[in-house]
Structures are given as structure tokens and as C-alpha cells.
Amino acid sequence: MKIVVKVGGSAIVQGLDAQRFKDYADVIKQLAEDHTILIVIGGGTPARDYINVSKQLGANNSILDYIGIGVSRLNARLLISALGDIAYPEPPYDYKDAGLAMYSGKVVVMGGVVPGQTTDAVAAILAEYVHADLLIRTTSVDGVFTADPKLDPKATKIDSMTPQELVDMVTKIEMTAGANNIFDPLGAQIVKRSRIPTVVVNGKQPENLIKAVKGEPIGTIIKE
């Protein structure tokens, strides 16, 4: 299969622990033995820290977006280092470059692309561009919930939903540079348009990627 994985920054780069990158690299190496893998990595806490400081310095939203993109590309380079020779050596700057890099036979790792697009949207657009068979979105919780489980103890996990239900849910969420949400509105719209099966899993356990690829009941499945 051709698989695009959105690795949430909150799942891998919080605290910038080298072991987390190694753990993800080990799982990705296993998947790459049988599948074509493209990774989009978010900015995580480091991006939000830089963005918060930039806000205090008076930076506008476009500048904040560029800062987030820059940090996500640094995170991509860290994962490339952890993957070693199986990784394409440079994070692509756009979807066309990523598509071309894919034909090298290497694992492609990239960050953000343009202002106004979160890495959720980048992953969804990339999946559509390369005709992926599966999109996996990792996050810091066990899937999509009826509310933020960190704030609402009554929130329940949704085992499966349609792309339209995802769109309806996320359009109520305000998106800002560095925002940490389950999915962004543009990404959700692309998932709906492309009809690519999508699974949202807890990224704190990298092995969940393998379970999602195997079709095991994990996280939230988004499909028609």
C-alpha cells in the first residue's frame, strides 16, 4: 500500500527526546519493508513556543505560519536522521517534490508547505496527490472524541465516522497558527473530497501505526 502518515508534533517532539524519534523510526522501517511510506510531521510544542514569542514581538499571522513551517521542517530533519539510509535525505518543499522523491524508493519526510495550511491539510493533500491508499493521523489521544477528553470527562471516543461528520465537527473549531486540534477544516475537506480511508490513532504508542495498517480496530476510522 501507499500510506501517508501525519505524525502530530505533540506525539513525537514534546520535550525533544531523541528516543521518541528512534521509536518512530523503528516502526516506520518495519512498515517501509512492505509499503510506500510518506510522512508529514507537525511542529508540536517547539513551534507553539516560537509562535507565542513571535506574537509578543508583533509578528503577523503569515509570519507565524512561516515560523511553524520552519520548525516542522526541523522536526522532519530529526526524523530523517533517525531513519538513516532508508529516508530521502531532504524534506520536500512542496507536493510535487514529495511525489518525485517518492519514486526514489525512500521514505519521504516533510513538514509544512505554505502559510494558511496546517500539517493536517498538508498530509491530506499529499495523500490525494500521490493517490495514497491510506492516511493515518496520529494525535495525543486515542482517536476522535465527542469533546476534548483532556477537558471534558464525559467525552467519548468515536470508533467510526464519515468524512462529512468529520467536516461538521471540525468546522466549529477556530484554527490559529500552531493550533493543536484533532483535524483542521481544510484537511477534513480534503479527506472528504479524496475519499481516502483515514485512521486517527494515539501517536504516543508508535506501534499503533502498524495496527492501523493491519486494519486492527484502533482509534477512529473515517470513511464513507
Curated annotation (Swiss-Prot):
Keywords: ATP-binding, Cytoplasm, Kinase, Nucleotide-binding, Pyrimidine biosynthesis, Transferase. Its EC number is 2.7.4.22. It is found in: Cytoplasm. Belongs to the UMP kinase family. CDD domains: AAK_UMPK-PyrH-Pf (cd04253). GO terms for cellular component: cytoplasm. One of its GO terms (molecular function) is UMP kinase activity. HAMAP family: PyrH_A (MF_01220_A). PANTHER family: URIDYLATE KINASE (PTHR42833), URIDYLATE KINASE PUMPKIN, CHLOROPLASTIC (PTHR42833:SF4). It comes from the Archaea. Inhibited by UTP. Catalyzes the reversible phosphorylation of UMP to UDP. UMP binds at residues 43, 65, 113-119. It catalyses: UMP + ATP = UDP + ADP. It comes from Methanocella arvoryzae (strain DSM 22066 / NBRC 105507 / MRE50). GO terms for biological process: 'de novo' CTP biosynthetic process; UDP biosynthetic process. ATP binds at residues 9-10, 44, 48, 139, 145, 148. Pathway: Pyrimidine metabolism; CTP biosynthesis via de novo pathway; UDP from UMP (UMPK route): step 1/1. Homohexamer. This is Uridylate kinase. It is an enzyme of class 2 (transferase).
